[in-house]
């Protein structure tokens, strides 16, 4: 799985990752911070997980908290809100829709 596939993945079907092709085409070149600033928090979190840099997770948290009426206390809490737990193993195929 490539970074762009993971970042724009919307779910899984068996061992196939389902990727939002339109969203990926429009935003694939954006950095983690750029995704967060565009309001694409789920995608920004996925990008931060892919980078394996804790400071990117904190950056997403800061951007999120600066724009919401309901700030969260940690990047782990924000990840739970968006259903992100890390990079999944075993996605052998990519389906773009």
Residue ranges of predicted features:
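Extended alpha-helical solenoid/arm regions of large eukaryotic scaffolding proteins
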Residues: 1-97
């Amino acid at each position: 799985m490539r970074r762009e596939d993971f970042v724009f993945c919307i779910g899984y079907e068996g061992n196939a990752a389902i990727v939002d092709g339109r969203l990926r085409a429009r935003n694939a070149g954006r950095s983690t911070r750029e995704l967060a600033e565009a309001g694409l928090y789920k995608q920004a979190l996925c990008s931060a997980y892919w980078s394996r840099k804790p400071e990117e997770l904190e950056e997403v948290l800061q951007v999120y908290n600066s724009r919401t009426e309901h700030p969260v206390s940690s990047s782990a809490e924000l990840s739970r809100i968006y259903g992100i737990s890390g990079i999944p193993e075993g996605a052998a195929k990519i389906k773009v829709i």
